[in-house]
């Protein structure tokens, strides 16, 4: 039986597994691997802090993901398909690993974050 997301160790498992899928994905992997050239040793701990703060309000994250994604969008236009694939991979990963209130919350927050980014980034493309 799967357990709920309960602590940072769970966040690390979720995010590491999720980004392993992202890196291998035909739709969005190239954005991370070839365009952004993500340094995973640096990026993953930032994402652990981000999601730990999103779910458990730890205050450990103090970046601005919108600025990073707006810059990336200037390099390669991000599309609704990119965001939908990100959402799909995130949801699948949560569902594979966890079950419970925080797992549901993680999926809801991921969808909210993706939706806000889509609105801001895609509307920026139409200016």
List each model region and its residues.
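Core of compact, soluble alpha-helical bundle domains
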Residues: 1-127
């Amino acid at each position: 039986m799967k357990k709920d997301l309960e602590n940072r160790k769970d966040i690390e498992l979720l995010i590491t597994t999720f980004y392993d899928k992202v890196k291998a994905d035909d739709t969005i992997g190239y954005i991370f691997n070839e365009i952004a050239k993500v340094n995973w040793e640096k990026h993953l701990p930032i994402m652990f802090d981000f999601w730990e703060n999103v779910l458990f309000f730890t205050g450990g994250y103090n970046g601005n993901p919108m600025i990073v994604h707006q810059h990336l969008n200037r390099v390669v236009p991000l599309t609704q398909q990119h965001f939908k694939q990100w959402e799909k991979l995130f949801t699948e990963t949560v569902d594979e690993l966890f079950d419970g209130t925080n797992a549901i919350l993680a999926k809801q927050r991921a969808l909210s974050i993706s939706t806000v980014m889509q609105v801001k980034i895609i509307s920026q493309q139409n200016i």
